[in-house]
Design a protein with these regions (language model features):
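Cysteine-centered catalytic environments shared across enzyme families
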Residues: 1-172
């Protein structure tokens, strides 16, 4: 079990969302005791709390990128990741880890959102694309991994546990 969280500042106001996201991550820290990673870019902040199952080395650290343009946060498992690795290596991709996160990242880079059609498993994937200044979040077909979304006029936020949203409440 891992945990993901993120906030998109829709109005680009001056509130420091990195501290808010760190507090969200502390609230759900039990989901990923092995590593915690953060990324802030423009009006996006992402975090990942990792329970290292597939590849316990730092090569599976998230948010993950192999080009500093496209970043992924991933919670779950792609059961057929070896099959997808074979398809991607046949067209020239190289892999440095045994992490299905790296497989998902490269599959997205190659096939875009159609990549998710290839995945068998249970997962939630969030992808920040700096080149397009965009973010997508996708769940597996059955929606087996928890994902909660909160949106108001200023923010869109997501978290693996609903209690993480407590951090969105400004201190009095």
């Amino acid at each position: 079990m891992c945990g993901i969280a993120g906030i998109i500042n829709k109005k680009n106001n001056s509130r420091d969302l990195s501290n808010v996201l760190k507090n969200m991550s502390k609230i759900i820290a039990h989901r990923g005791p092995d590593q915690t990673g953060f990324l802030q870019y423009n009006n996006f902040v992402l975090s990942h709390l990792r329970l290292a199952v597939m590849d316990p080395r730092n090569l599976g650290r998230q948010p993950m990128s192999n080009d500093d343009n496209i970043f992924i946060v991933f919670n779950g498992e792609i059961y057929n990741f070896k099959e997808i690795i074979n398809k991607l290596t046949d067209i020239g991709y190289k892999f440095i880890s045994n992490s299905d996160t790296e497989v998902a990242l490269n599959a997205y880079k190659e096939w875009g959102i159609k990549a998710f059609d290839y995945f068998n498993g249970d997962w939630i994937i969030g992808i920040l694309n700096k080149l397009e200044n965009s973010f997508i979040i996708v769940k597996d077909r059955l929606g087996s991994k928890p994902l909660y979304i909160y949106e108001d006029g200023e923010y869109l936020s997501f978290c693996s546990e609903i209690k993480g949203f407590q951090a969105l409440i400004p201190p009095e």
